Amino acid sequence: MNKLIAIAIVSLPLLTHFSAQADASEQLKVKLAEIDNLKANFSQTVTDINDKVIQTGEGVFALAQPNQFYWHLTAPDESLIVADGTDVWIYNPFNEEVSVMDVNQAISASPIALLVHDDAKTWAQYQVTNTDQCFAISPIDKDAGVSEVEVCFNETTLTEMVLKDQQGNTSSFLLSEQTTLDKSEKNLFKFVVPEDVDIDDQRLKSPN
């Protein structure tokens, strides 16, 4: 679940084949352009296909343009996701393991990437529709792990993200106490590998 959220939370795109979708995409782009950086607390609720609550949690969320992301689940079990602009690090303290992938791998895999990625080629992989202050983003590739991401705003403030996976599970994240990052908090996007942890390096290696 955490890896799915990690991939999902580093991505968000646009489709211009139909005017309604193009309008929704442009509206979302405008709202995201107003968020240069953000830090907030979040509360998480995960429900299954029958709307039964299967997990709750809380933590701290931050993002900065371009391609920087911080996701620290503090309860019930700690986990950390950091996108530093180049790589995405997924750290599980309990298992003493960290996975790392290219940020482009995460961006191409899920709709939440648009939060921190303004690239027409990436946006073209998704459909965007909107209702009032909420935008639903779904991948054109139906084999993606995340079937839909919904992001909601109160005017220019990002207030909620909802992730729906192919198994019918829904993860809802309510944001609170939103602030802009100060200089010292930019270090949130720098992941330092702890001692004595296993590293699962999934980054695509360029051929020599």
UniProtKB/Swiss-Prot annotation:
- Its main localization is periplasm
* The protein's name: Outer-membrane lipoprotein carrier protein
Question: Partners and quaternary state?
Answer: Monomer.
Functional description taken from the UniProt entry: Participates in the translocation of lipoproteins from the inner membrane to the outer membrane. Only forms a complex with a lipoprotein if the residue after the N-terminal Cys is not an aspartate (The Asp acts as a targeting signal to indicate that the lipoprotein should stay in the inner membrane).
Q: State the UniProt keywords alphabetically.
A: Chaperone, Periplasm, Protein transport, Signal, Transport
UniProt lists the family membership as follows: Belongs to the LolA family.
- Domain of life assignment: Bacteria
HAMAP family xrefs: LolA
Point out the signal peptide segment.
1-22
**Among the record's GO biological process terms, what is one?**
lipoprotein localization to outer membrane
- Source organism of this protein record: Shewanella piezotolerans (strain WP3 / JCM 13877)
Q: Identify the GO cellular component terms for this protein.
A: outer membrane-bounded periplasmic space
Localization recorded for this chain is: Periplasm
